[in-house]
Amino acid sequence: MVKERIDTGGKVFGPYSPGVKANGIIWLAGQIAPEAGGIREQTQASLDKIDALLAAAGVSKHEVTFAQVLLNDISDFTDMNEIYGAWLDGVEIPPARAAFEAAALPGGAAVEIVIQAYDDKCCA
């Protein structure tokens, strides 16, 4: 098995990889963007980071199989969901997803998004 670090050079806050790819499975660490503004802006900025990491792994949002969305305040769900849904526009099969409230997120973020994807070119 080959294990590969996925990185776009962004800042990390601890001993972890922004993403890891092994045997065609891609895991992205939770993406946050507390500097971006409100929930809508933070959601979009987090998804932009996810797009960049997926591209670094050689895939796109079309290969995302699971998303986990953590919200500092569950009342932000509707705004987050609108931005998230627009991001998925054109994706034939949307990923499975879980979304829930977390008491506190790193850096004072309002939203954190964790992604799992696959690379079907890997192991054919």
Residue positions per predicted region:
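N-terminal presequence-like segments and the immediate start of the first folded domain
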Residues: 1-65, 71-124
